[in-house]
Amino acid sequence: MPIKIFNLITTFIFITSFTQCANQGAPGGGPVDKQPPVVIKTTPNTDSIRVPVNLRDIYIEFSERMEEGSVSKAVFISPPLNYEYKWSRSRKLKLVITDTLLEQQTYVVSIGTEASDEHSNKLESSYQFAFSTGEKIDKGSIAGKVYGIQKNETFNIFAFILSDSGKQDFIKRKPRYISQSGKDGQYSLNFLKADTYRLFAVQDLNNNLLIDADYEKIGIPLKDITINDKQLNFTGLNFRISKVDTVAPYFTGIRPVNNEYLQLRVSEPLILNDKTNLHIIDSLNSDTLKILGRSVNYESDNIIDIFTETMDTSARYQLFSNYIEDSSGNRNITRQKVNFISNLKTDTTGLKLIEFIPADSAKSVYPATPVYLEFSRPVNWKSVENNFNLMNGERDTLTGNWKILSVYDAEFYPGVPFETDSSYTAFLNFGKISDLWGKLFEDSLIHHYFSFISSRELGEVSGKVSADSLLPGPVYLTLKKLSKGQGKNYFRQKLDKPGVYRIEQVPEGQYGLSVYWDLDKNNQYSAGRLFPFSFAEPFSVLADTIKVRKRWETQGVNIKLPVPGGK
C-alpha cells in the first residue's frame, strides 16, 4: 500500500511539473504593457533613390507583435499602389506590390496611428518613409492639427493635387497623399512634390479612402497650400471637424400626443424662423386648424412640437409645408404633406412655474447670468413680457430683451448689464400670465431678490487679435473655462475687426481661448461647404492655458488669425 501511494505521489508531481513547463510565459501579475509600438526597420530604406519600377516587396518591421487587422487599416502608399499583405510572426509585414511603379516618382508609405500592438497600444504618431524611382526625394510638407475630435479618435488627412483633374471632384476620387492624425489631433504630410494641394480631414468610417459627407464628419480647409522652392514646408493648416450636410430636410412622420399637441418628425434638426412654413387643414372641408406655437422638442432635435387649437375628433387633418430649412442651411421648398387624426386625450398638466433663476435670496450671482423662466405648459410669452418687471437697488425699472428658447422657457437680458456688488429684484405677476390657449395661471405675485458677486472676486483677460491681412468681417472670441468651479463656463466677445480686446468679470480658474473670423457675417462659425465648394472661416486656438486670478488683469494674451484663401 505505501508503495502504491508513493507511486501516485510521484506521478502527480511529474504531471504537475510537466504542465508547468508546457505553459511557460510571462509571469502573472506583471506590469501591463502600455508602451506604444514603433517602426524599427523598412525596406527600401527611407530616402532611397533609383528604386526599380518593378519593385515587388516593401518590408516594415515593428518593435513588437502587432494586431494585424488594425495595421491593414492604417497603411497607405502615396501615390496609390495595389498590394497584398503578408505577415511573419505579426512583427514583420511584407507588402507585395502588384503594380508597376512610375518613373521619377517619390513614393510615401504611411503607417497611421490606428495601427496597434497586441495589447491595443497605438502608434503615438503617424510614421512615414519615402523612396524614389528617380534621382531625388520630394521634400515638401504640410502640418497642422485637427480640432473637435474625441480622445483617441483618429481622422485621415486626404491631400488632393488640384492639377490632377480639371474638375474638383473630391467626392469621387481618392486622394494622392494620405496621413492620419495622432496624439492630440496633430498630423503631418511629408515628402510632397511641388504643387498646389487641397487637404481635408476625414472620419472615413468605412476605410474606403473617399469623402462620404452624408454620414462622415469632415474638416474643410481655410485655403489651398502651394509647395514650391519658396515655401517647401507649411505649418498651421488646422481643421475644425463638423458634419457637412448636403441633403435637404424632409418629413418622416407625425404623432398626435393629445387633442392640442402634435410631434412632427423630421429627417434632421430644423431652424425654426419666420420662413418656416407649416399649416394644417381638415381634408374633409378645407377648414384651417390654427397653429398656436411650435418649438424644437427637448429630448430630440429631430422632433418639432406643434401646439394647435383643440382638434375635431371627426376631422381628417393634413399638415403641409413648402419651406423648411435645416441647421446646415439646406432648404426644402417642395410641397410636403403628412396625414393624421386627432388623439382623444386631453392634457391635464397643471400651470406651474418650474424654474425662476436667479433664485430668491441668491447671493454672489455672476453678472453674465440672465433671468431665466420655465413653465410647465406652453406659455403666451407676450403675457409674460407684459407682467414681468426688473428693478435695481434704487427701485429703478430696467428694460431689456427676451430671448425665447422654446414655448416653455426664455431668458431676459437687461439693456444695461447687471453690475457687480449690486442687488436687483425681479417681479412676476403670475395671475395674469396665460398659456397658449388663454388659460390663466394661479393668481399670485412672485418676486426674487438677488445680489451679484463682488468685483474683488473676479479677474480680467486682455490682449490682441492680429492677422497679416485685414478683411471685412467681425471677430468672435470665446474664453472657455477648463477647470471646475462656480460661475459661467465661457465668455464670448465680438470685435468689429482684429484688434485689442478685454474680457471682464471673469471668475478665477483656468481657461482656453479661441477666435474665429466671421467673414460671412452670420454670427456663427462657418465650417465650409463641399457643394458648391467654399473654404472654412479662419480660426485659431491658443496653445497655452490662461490662468485667471481674482483682482488681477491677465495681460498680453495675444492670438493670431490665419489668412484664408479665395472662394
Predicted segments, located by residue:
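Bacterial Sec-dependent N-terminal signal peptides
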Residues: 1-37, 501, 564-567
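Low-complexity, intrinsically disordered short peptide segments enriched in small/polar/basic residues
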Residues: 2, 6, 10-12, 215, ...
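Alpha-helix termination/capping residues and helix-transition junctions
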Residues: 15, 191-194, 508
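Acidic, low-complexity Ser/Thr/Gly/Pro-rich repeat segments typical of extracellular/periplasmic
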Residues: 21-184, 188-202, 214-218, 243-461, ...
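Structured interaction patches on ligand/partner-binding surfaces of diverse proteins
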Residues: 125, 203-243, 335-338, 343, ...
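C-terminal soluble interaction/assembly domains
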Residues: 428, 436, 464, 469, ...
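Gram-negative outer-membrane assembly/targeting C-terminal domains
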Residues: 553-567
